[in-house]
Regions:
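Non-heme Fe(II)/2-oxoglutarate
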Residues: 1-9, 59, 187-194, 214-216, ...
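Non-heme Fe(II)-dependent double-stranded beta-helix
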Residues: 1-25, 32-140
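Glycine-rich nucleotide phosphate-binding loop and flanking beta-alpha elements
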Residues: 37, 146, 223
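Short, structured patches in soluble enzyme cores that scaffold and shape functional sites
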Residues: 142-144, 162-166, 178
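Extracellular structured ligand-interaction cores
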Residues: 28, 137, 155-159, 171, ...
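Acidic, His- and aromatic-enriched active-site or binding-groove loops in soluble protein domains
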Residues: 136-154
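Short helix-to-loop capping/linker segments positioned immediately adjacent to catalytic or ligand/cofactor-binding
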Residues: 93, 112-114, 146-151, 161-164, ...
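Double-stranded beta-helix
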Residues: 21, 154, 166-224, 249
Length: 269
């Protein structure tokens, strides 16, 4: 595993040619200090309010997408995976619609849009490593698997990760295999066992991020989240993911069926 094996960038009013070229070659890019500490705290507070509401009301799904519940280090019920967060949080919605996110659409062909109401919407993942946790790590996968299961053409997409906590090897951390976003369909389907394979890859790169950093990856790239070697509160890792997509507009509603690929999410622990 390689650490600090890539440059980090500053996000300006528009992307530079150097930044676009780096993303095109590697399939990911890391921007430092995109969100302020105040913005991060506001977003975290809003997710805690959402969590309290969903637990109180016993909500199981949002627009057909299951909510992943579990326990924290104090054995309290928590939400590990929040779907469609921006529909319930003004703070998240405002950040998602800010110019910082809008400018990233230039990494995709014309017609790219932020999918607040499509797929799983804006996701917040809350990892914590305790014996009772349902969300300690996530095995190798590509985000494009969803399109494959529905028999759709695999189109380029972005997953924009805003880090709400510091995240390095001590938290497990995101691992990506640079350049795999250009792989053929066979390798996308069969190179690794989706979610079940959590083994280290000799070509993987550790994403070492601070709270407020933003890491953008192509949906076709192989990536995983490793399990923290630490037990308890110090293992906490929260990341908000914003999808930017192409193709036909397909919004989700309360009547939407549960997508088939979510059966695989049961393998994620």
């Amino acid at each position: 595993m390689k650490k600090e094996a890539y440059p980090k960038f500053a996000l300006g009013d528009s992307l530079t040619s150097e930044q676009s070229d780096f993303f095109k070659k590697n399939g990911f890019i890391h921007f430092e200090g995109v969100a302020s500490a105040q913005e991060i705290q506001s977003i975290i507070a809003s997710t805690e309010r959402i969590q309290e509401r969903w637990l109180r009301e016993g909500v199981k799904k949002i627009n057909g997408v299951p909510i992943k519940y579990g326990k924290d280090e104090n054995n309290k019920d928590i939400v590990h995976r929040f779907p469609f967060t921006s529909q319930y949080s003004e703070e998240v919605h405002n950040f998602v619609q800010s110019a910082r996110i809008q400018n990233l659409k230039s990494l995709l062909p014309p017609g790219a849009r932020i999918a607040e109401n499509e797929k799983d919407g804006v996701i917040v993942n809350h990892y914590v490593n305790i014996p009772e946790s349902n969300f300690r790590q996530m095995g190798w996968h590509t985000d494009s698997m969803r399109d494959i299961f529905y028999g759709k053409k695999v189109l380029p997409m972005l997953n924009v990760g805003l880090y709400l906590d510091n995240s390095s090897a001590d938290k497990g951390g995101l691992r990506v295999i640079p350049g795999t976003h250009t792989q053929n369909m066979f390798n996308m389907l069969f190179k690794k066992a989706y979610f079940m394979n959590t083994d280290e890859d000799k070509s993987e790169v550790l994403v070492d991020a601070k709270a407020g950093d933003m890491v953008v990856h192509d949906g076709r790239i192989w990536h995983r989240v490793a399990q923290s070697p630490i037990i308890g509160a110090l293992s906490r890792r929260r990341v908000m993911y914003i999808p930017i997509i192409l193709g036909k507009y397909m919004p989700k509603t309360n009547d939407s069926a549960t997508p088939f690929y979510h059966h695989f999410m049961k393998l994620v622990r």
